[in-house]
């Protein structure tokens, strides 16, 4: 976290309070806020022409790295093969509406659709309400190119109840039709991190391991890229680079094959 950006955010809020009676750090939207970004991006994705190869740009934790987000957008826009961008949570740093707006203003310059999951930083203050207004549900799924993506909330520490992640919902989503060739789960906190609900870790990973055609579990949160099989159960977990590292993970998926590369920018 960079002190300069924190001071900028605080200064902006003070100026807004001085200049307008309308602004509150607790508000979930204003007249300039984008709405239903998930629905709009999914519509854009479904309108695109798919082929036998699915290409994903995967990154996470934008927080207050605005310059790095701009660099990411410029680089991805040069990658014509990319079908979809996945952002693994922590869109904001303090859950503030203005932070969400600053990041989405930049991400909306992408030439390809993007999907952003909710992170633990996004739940600070009124951030959950901001996310729901700006993006939509915290848990949802969609199918593209015979691949089912299951987007879900794993920010267990931010909730006092033990129902995050929502295991019954997740089990139902993993029970897929035969025409689905592969399943990719996307969330912020990985199950092997201390911020995940320890009481649900075993059931969560076993659910993935027992699901036919489960391909990948993608996460952010830990602020470094990892790729492996932490439970030795055949399930591959990948965590993203963060925006400040100026690199993203590029995944090419076709047939029963997966090719991963790291793209600097």
Each model region followed by its residue ranges:
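Core catalytic region of metal-dependent phosphoesterases/phosphodiesterases
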Residues: 69-139, 143-144
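Beta-strand-turn-beta hairpins that frame and shape the catalytic cleft
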Residues: 46-56, 141-151, 177-184, 230-236, ...
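N-terminal active-site segment of His-dependent metallophosphoesterases
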Residues: 18-102
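Binuclear metal-dependent phosphoesterase catalytic core
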Residues: 21-37, 43, 59, 226-265
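His/acidic metal-ligating clusters that form di-metal
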Residues: 20, 77-84, 159-234, 261
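Sec-dependent signal peptide recognition
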Residues: 2-9
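Active-site neighborhood of phospho(di)ester-bond hydrolases with catalytic His/Asp-centered motifs
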Residues: 58-61, 84-90, 113-120, 152, ...
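C-terminal motif of bacterial Sec signal peptides marking the signal peptidase cleavage site
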Residues: 13-16
